[in-house]
């Protein structure tokens, strides 16, 4: 079977392949980021989003791969064979897991549309001959600030800003903080 884990999210393995392997942070850094930002939602029994589900699955797969690597390390007698297996897991499987973790963490952090736009921008940039492209590659975290997307049928923005509304002098009521997971 030819299964593309990014297909339902509007991306593809090919689109992510434009990013060099050293672009992706280490698995440890990605796991720490996922935990710091999304731990409550990832551990929740509630369904938050397809990205949360995919992130859970990638984290579980990596855990199982580490169990396999530990087992191989303990049970394979030949050091050369053991090194080959561990190296294969780290290089090939590690890259795929790093890509998955990066993609879903980025989609949750920046939004799917922004991440897809970044992947396309980077793909165009990397395929453009160096003499004809900007010196620096696109940067994901700056896309929301610099990208202007105009929808069809909308009138262009007015040139003069509307007058500011006077703010109420009374303090704003805060929403009660619930203990439910933040998705």
Swiss-Prot record:
Gene Ontology biological process terms, A to Z: microtubule-dependent intracellular transport of viral material towards nucleus; symbiont entry into host cell; viral penetration into host nucleus
Chief subcellular location: virion
Claim: Transferase is one of the keywords in the record: no
Bipartite nuclear localization signal (motif): residue ranges: 158-175
Compartment annotation: Virion; Host cytoplasm
Keywords: Capsid protein, Cytoplasmic inwards viral transport, DNA-binding, Host cytoplasm, Host-virus interaction, Microtubular inwards viral transport, Phosphoprotein, Repeat, RNA-binding, T=4 icosahedral capsid protein, Viral penetration into host nucleus, Virion, Virus entry into host cell
PTM characteristics: Phosphorylated by host SRPK1, SRPK2, and maybe protein kinase C or GAPDH. Phosphorylation is critical for pregenomic RNA packaging. Protein kinase C phosphorylation is stimulated by HBx protein and may play a role in transport of the viral genome to the nucleus at the late step during the viral replication cycle.
Biased composition (Basic residues): 149-176
Residue ranges of the region described as RNA binding: 177-183
Post-translational modification Phosphoserine, affected residues: 155, 162, 170
InterPro entries (UniProt xref): Hepatitis_core, Viral_capsid_core_dom_sf_HBV
Gene Ontology molecular function, alphabetical: DNA binding; RNA binding; structural molecule activity
Stretches for region Disordered: 143-183
Renumbered residue ranges of the record's region 3 X 8 AA repeats of S-P-R-R-R-[PR]-S-Q: 155-177
Sequence repeats: 155-161, 162-169, 170-177
GO cellular component: host cell; host cell cytoplasm; T=4 icosahedral viral capsid
Chain segments annotated as transmembrane: none
Subunit structure: Homodimerizes, then multimerizes. Interacts with cytosol exposed regions of viral L glycoprotein present in the reticulum-to-Golgi compartment. Interacts with human FLNB. Phosphorylated form interacts with host importin alpha; this interaction depends on the exposure of the NLS, which itself depends upon genome maturation and/or phosphorylation of the capsid protein. Interacts with host NUP153.
Function field: Self assembles to form an icosahedral capsid. Most capsids appear to be large particles with an icosahedral symmetry of T=4 and consist of 240 copies of capsid protein, though a fraction forms smaller T=3 particles consisting of 180 capsid proteins. Entering capsids are transported along microtubules to the nucleus. Phosphorylation of the capsid is thought to induce exposure of nuclear localization signal in the C-terminal portion of the capsid protein that allows binding to the nuclear pore complex via the importin (karyopherin-) alpha and beta.
Family named by the database record: Belongs to the orthohepadnavirus core antigen family.
Annotated protein name in UniProt: Capsid protein
Organism: Hepatitis B virus genotype B2 (isolate Vietnam/9873/1997)
Gene name of this polypeptide: C
């Amino acid at each position: 079977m030819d299964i593309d884990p990014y297909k339902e999210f509007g991306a593809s393995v090919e689109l992510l392949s434009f990013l060099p392997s050293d672009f992706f942070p280490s698995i440890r850094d990605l796991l720490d980021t996922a935990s710091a930002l999304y731990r409550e939602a990832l551990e929740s029994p509630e369904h938050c989003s397809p990205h949360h589900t995919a992130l859970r699955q990638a984290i579980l797969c990596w855990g199982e791969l580490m169990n396999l690597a530990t087992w191989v390390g303990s049970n394979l007698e030949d050091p050369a064979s053991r090194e080959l297996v561990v190296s294969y897991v780290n290089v090939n499987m590690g890259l795929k897991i790093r890509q998955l973790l990066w993609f879903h963490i980025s989609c949750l952090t920046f939004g799917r549309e922004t991440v897809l736009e970044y992947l396309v921008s980077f793909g165009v940039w990397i395929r453009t001959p160096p003499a004809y492209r900007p010196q620096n590659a696109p940067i994901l975290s700056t896309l929301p600030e610099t990208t202007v997307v105009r929808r069809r049928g909308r009138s262009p923005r007015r040139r003069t800003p509307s007058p500011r509304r006077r703010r109420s002098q009374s303090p704003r009521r805060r929403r009660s903080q619930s203990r439910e997971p933040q998705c």
